[in-house]
């Protein structure tokens, strides 16, 4: 998320950082220090109210929404499906599906009247993967949103596309997705995900943050003006 925001700002985008973490202020400061334009808002994107407030904030700041990047999500628990509790299944789907579902709805409310806009959903090649069935289901839903919504709004000037990242080398998260992971999942269960991700990638490695940000920014740009309704795998040859 940070890499996409900083690169977008460096190319002239007016960037609104939406996050519950206080780290959003650090990203805004870095963008401004580099000469870019950015602001932030703290809302819960797992709720309709939070998504609606975020979109309205962008409109209040700059009068319109040209690009929405839906980047909320991530596996909370890594384990075989029979070990998931019902509340954990609910939490995985709420984390990795509903922010995209709600933000798409909130964004098109502003994009449709202006007759233009691009939505880039961040999916995952893990729609076909081990030890994260609820997450896979949620990201499969993101792919379905992308295809179906694109069809509805294509003739009204809006593109809806998705990038599906594979394994990515990234620094530790500032706010862990699951602070109790060591107690709630076995190390070998998580290692299965790592091994499967590398095995499935033709390049046999994880990607970099820039290798993931580049396709997202391409899909958001006018260079992709004839692309909509598809999910582009960015996983070193793993199609998901």
Residue ranges and their predicted role:
Residues 66, 82-102, 116, 120, ...:
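Catalytic Tyr-X3-Lys loop
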Residues 155, 167-200:
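A glycine/serine/threonine-rich, flexible loop-to-helix segment
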Residues 75-90, 113, 131-134, 173-178, ...:
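Conserved mid-core segment of classical short-chain dehydrogenase/reductases
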Residues 42-54, 86, 210-211:
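The beta1-alpha1 cofactor-binding region of Rossmann-like NAD(H)/NADP(H)-dependent oxidoreductases
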